Amino acid sequence: MSAVNTQRNSLRAGMIGMGMIFDETYRPMFQALHAEGLYRRDFGYVDVALTAVATRTGARARAYKKSADGRLADFTSFEGTDSVERAVAAGIDFVCVASPDDRHFDAAKQGLQAGRHVLIEKPSVLQLQQLDELVALARDKNLLAKVVYHKLCDPDHKKLRTLVEDGELLHVNNGYCSLLEPRSISKGQFAEWIAGRNPGTYVAVHYIKLIDFTFGGRLKTVACTGQRGIVGPADGNTW
C-alpha cells in the first residue's frame, strides 16, 4: 500500500467565458471543489478555488455571484476587451477557456504566455497552425495545455470504451453518425459561437475524439458531408 501524502496544496483557477458550458460543467465542478476540495492519497489534499473570471460584459459573472449564495468563494470579475489579459495576470495557476470558439486561440495563448496551465473546450482552435503554435508554446514553457471533451463522460461514450476494454467489441469496419437539430439551435442559442466554424469543428470533433478515446487512435479515414444554406448563404460554407 502506498504512503498517504498529508501535504495540503492549493490551485487558483481562472475562467474565460461564463456561458452555457460554464453553467453545465464548470459551475458544478467548482462548487463541488469549494465544498469538498480535491484529494487523492498520493498527492494529498488540494484546495481548488475559482479566483478570476473574464467576460465581455460582466453580466453573467454578476448574476452568478448573486446566485452562488456561499457555494463558492468570492472571485474577481474582469470585463471588457482586455478582460482575458487582466484575468490571466491575476495570480492564477491555470485557466479554463470556454468562450466562443473563435476566441479560444487568443485566450489560450495569453494564458500560456503568462505561465498558466490551460484547459480549452473543444474545438481547441479553428486552424491547425494555431494548434501547432499553442503546443510549441506549452512545451517551451513546460506547461499543460489540454482539450476538454465533455461528452466523453456521457454514459454511451463510456459504455463503448468499456466494451472495447473488456474485449467484447474487437473490430469495427465502418461507423456513421448524423446531426439533426432545429435551425434555431445554430441560428439562436449558438449564434455567437458559430463564427468561423464548420461541420468538423462544430460537432464532428466529438465523434473523432470518441473514436480516439475508444480505440486508441486506430482511425484510417474520416469523411463528412453537409448542406449549404442552413446556417449561412446558399453559396457559402457547407453545413
Where are these predicted regions, by residue range?
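Short helix/strand-capping hinge loops at secondary-structure junctions
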Residues: 115-117, 121-123
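Rossmann-like NAD(P)(H) cofactor-binding subdomain of soluble oxidoreductases
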Residues: 123, 146-152
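Structural detector of well-ordered beta-strand residues that form the stable sheet scaffold
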Residues: 119, 144-146, 176
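A general structural signal for well-ordered alpha-helical segments in protein cores
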Residues: 27, 61, 131, 157, ...
